[in-house]
């Protein structure tokens, strides 16, 4: 269904666990879902250096900093998320949800076992765009967050009929996002 309806671009039709001869955190099509990848553009971390508080109704971008993209010995690229910090990223993939399918983005157990929490986020019927991924390092140590590798999984739920009013129909505020999009009211 995902490839026929072009729901995911670019689409990896099989679960990839290796790239360039190195093990990666899995990405691509899985049993009833898709392991989405974190892109190497737009990643930001909340910091008190410039921001005093976070107000989701009046979001101030100065509360975010852009961390350095690092390269591991094996060539893998990653961001280092400090202990007890929260970050925002965006997926490599662009999603286009049909009117009869809703998705739910959840975290991966590989990251959860290392202390990383990925916020559960719906991909409503009719929504399209690159998904903003909200992540938290709950550990007491800095945590590597790899780009172009799996960051979470999307589970798909298909209905027998189209929804009456889609995310697009009601003019959803995050419709068509192509990069990191901050909180809106």
Task: Please place each PLM-identified region on the residue numbering.
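Non-catalytic terminal segments and appended small domains
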Residues: 1-185
